[in-house]
Structure formats: structure tokens, C-alpha cells
């Protein structure tokens, strides 16, 4: 999977990380950091689903 979640050090917040760049994922040019657990989990699932769909459509 391209996108993963990482807990921010010393905080109860999360970031969604792009495994290609090893930086926070960008949505509308906004780094996806300081998210609560549920939001980070949902966003990670969504971004990975969109990435899979883009990869599949690029092959056809």
C-alpha cells in the first residue's frame, strides 16, 4: 500500500504518509498531519483505494 499512518511523537495525533515520498500525503496541497485516529484511518483507506483505481485504469 502506498499510504500509511504514523503516530506523531509525544502526541495523540496521526499523519498519513506517502510511502513513495516518505512525506505527509497532500490533499489539495495540504499536508495530512495532526489528524485524529479515525480521520487518519479513513483517509488512508480512501487514498489507497484511489491509488489502486488509478493504477488499474492506467494498465487498461
Whereabouts are the PLM-identified features?
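Short N-terminal "domain-start" leader segments
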Residues: 1-23, 41-53
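Low-complexity intrinsically disordered segments
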Residues: 55-60
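A short, exposed loop/beta-hairpin motif centered on an aromatic-Gly-Thr core
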Residues: 23-39
Amino acid at each position: 500500500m502506498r499510504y500509511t499512518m504514523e503516530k506523531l511523537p509525544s502526541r495523540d495525533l496521526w499523519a498519513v504518509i506517502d510511502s513513495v515520498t516518505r512525506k505527509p500525503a497532500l490533499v489539495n496541497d495540504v499536508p495530512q498531519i495532526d489528524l485524529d485516529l479515525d480521520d487518519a484511518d479513513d483517509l488512508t483507506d480512501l487514498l489507497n483505494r484511489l491509488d489502486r483505481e488509478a493504477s488499474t485504469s492506467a494498465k487498461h
